[in-house]
Regions:
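Active-site phosphate-binding/coordination module
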Residues: 96
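Sec/Tat signal peptide C-region and signal peptidase I cleavage site
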Residues: 17-23
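Hydrophobic helical h-region of N-terminal Sec-dependent signal peptides
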Residues: 11-15
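Exported/periplasmic ABC-transporter solute-binding proteins
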Residues: 23-50, 54-56, 61, 65-71, ...
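Bacterial N-terminal signal peptides that target proteins for export
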Residues: 1-10
């Protein structure tokens, strides 16, 4: 075989192998509230000799819409149960998936705002009245935003809070509105409130979980997902992953 032909053959073979490897890399869509916990879980997954996965963070609603329109996500780590079940109904996933965690809603306040958080309704009214803006995730896209509105209405705080609300595409962005001072108060996941970046700038208060629908976070595997996505799906249900989730404030099944 002439040398130039051999070189072309080897180069073509290299391209084919590279494309095959890239095509098999799992792409995981992860709800923003899971960012810190998922990062640690992913590190643990790789430490067991598994291949790296590509990770994208955002809102469960946006991810669902993107998957419906052909986005190549192999695994959705959602912040609720509605969106994964909808993907199954639309024939995108292999089944309805499983609940991997139950989230907790909290209120956070910017330390420099000087707003006291208390589970006393009187104190909450004072806090809301003092706040300039209150950040939440968009309720149609993010389960933690939906839970925040349910809480405000159930607690009788909706009328004094509604005109101060500013909406973010996901709970991670809503949280950063408070961290950066764009809002004095906000609703977020306890896992984000406990993160180093957020906790040094804010304080938080747990919201009564009886005042909003349980945030049962479900994950679902798409049809045609590569083996690595299936491996990660199984790892998320392991005792090691559950221990990490619990550390970040989640309950696990």
């Amino acid at each position: 075989m002439p040398e130039i032909t051999l070189r072309l053959f080897i180069f073509s073979l290299f391209l084919l192998v590279s494309q095959s490897v890239f095509a098999q890399q799992a792409i995981v869509a992860v709800a923003a509230n899971m960012k810190d916990a998922f990062g640690e879980i992913n590190t643990a997954f790789k430490s067991e000799g598994n291949r790296d996965v590509r990770v994208v963070y955002g809102s469960s609603g946006n991810f669902t819409a993107q998957i419906m329109n052909g986005a190549p996500f192999n695994l959705l780590i959602s912040a609720d149960g509605h969106f994964p079940i909808e993907l199954y109904r639309q024939g995108k996933s292999i089944d309805e998936g499983v609940v991997y965690a139950i989230g907790q809603l909290v209120i956070i306040s910017k330390n420099s705002a000087g707003i006291r958080l208390s589970d006393s309704k009187t104190e909450l009214i004072k806090a809301i009245n003092k706040a300039n803006k209150i950040a939440i995730a968009k309720p149609d896209l993010a389960p933690y935003g939906k839970a925040a509105i349910e809480y405000l209405k159930a607690e009788g705080l909706w009328n004094i809070a509604k005109d101060k609300l500013i909406y973010a595409d996901n709970v991670g962005i809503a949280t950063m509105y408070v961290v950066t001072g764009a809002a004095d108060l906000g609703f977020t996941a306890i896992s984000l409130a406990k993160s180093a970046e957020v906790s040094k700038e804010t304080n938080f208060m747990l919201v009564d979980s009886k005042l909003y629908e349980p945030i049962k976070q479900r994950m679902v595997l798409m049809k045609g997902a590569p083996q690595e996505a299936l491996s990660f799906y199984r790892f998320m249900q392991s005792a090691q992953a559950k221990s990490i989730l619990q550390k970040y404030g989640y309950s696990t099944p």
